[in-house]
Structure formats: structure tokens, C-alpha cells
Amino acid sequence: MTEYETYKETAISSFRLAVELFNRPYENGREEGVLILLDHSFEMLLKAAILRRGGEIRADDGSGQTVSLETCVKRCRDGTRDNQRMQCLSKSEAAAIFSLNNLRDYAQHEQVDVREQQLYLQSRQCSDIFEAILTRVFNESLSQYLPERVLPLSTTVPTDIAT
């Protein structure tokens, strides 16, 4: 397995866990877990995308550490002077990932209180962006990694599908 495939598999595993936690029937740790795992899934997926497109994810300081999510988003939004092929995010998709990362910061370091509709909309948007990156960079679909039986259930109908 190549390095980018390893990062992609980790991304998909984190995304699956986020879906599982989102659909959890009780609240303990649910909001925090969903945000943390979605954020992690994007960091790993963007690192996989950068590697797949011939970029570098190790810091220039010789430490061997990988670059931050923020750096990954910027590279995938703008490319680099030496490699424009890394571009795989629109400005609005990048903004959505930055928004997720800010919510994740609160979930990780503070107390987060995300309303159910906000968590749903953030998670739905993340699903769409994750799918788009898989398609653009890897020519794959999220449906290849999630069983058809996955169905978000709730006691309230999300506003984007209400009739």
C-alpha cells in the first residue's frame, strides 16, 4: 500500500466513525466525537490528496512532522508555486473545512454546544465535500465505503429535506 493509500484509508475510517457517532442514540460525547473525527478525516484525506498529486506533507524544518490541516487546506485550495495539480478544493469548500476545524477546536479544548440542526448541516456539508475530494482526486465515491443501509435517523426532520 502506498503512503497516500494509507492516509486515505485512515481518512475513510475516521469518516465512518463520525457517521457512526452522528447516528448514536445517546448524547454523551456525540457532538465532540463527530466534530473531532470529521476534522481528522479531512486532515488525512487532504494529506492523501497532496501525496497523490505529487506534493509533500512533511514540514520543511527537518523534524519529520507532517503539516497542519490549515496548511493542507491552503495547498489543496491554492496549489503551490511548484505544483498547481494539488488544487482540489474550491474556496467555499476550504472555508467549510476551516469552519469545521474551528468547531473542532472548541470541542477539543473548550465546552462545545452545537445545536442539532447545526451539527446536521455541518456533517451533511462535510459529507458532500468528502465525496467531492474522493471523486476529484481518487476517482472514487463515498458509497464505495459506506454500506447502503446507512440512514440518518432522528426525531426531527432535517430542514433541508422537510417538505
Predicted regions and their residues:
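Active-site-adjacent bridging/hinge elements
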Residues: 8-19, 101-105
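Short, glycine/acidic-rich hinge or "gate" loops at secondary-structure transitions
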Residues: 29-32, 53-64, 144-149
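Short, charged/polar, low-complexity loop and linker segments
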Residues: 19-23, 78-85, 104-110
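Charge-enriched, short contiguous segments at helix-coil
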Residues: 88-143
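Short, hydrophobic, well-ordered secondary-structure elements
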Residues: 12, 31-52, 124-127
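Polyanionic, low-complexity intrinsically disordered segments
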Residues: 131-163
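An N-terminal domain-cap segment
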Residues: 18-36
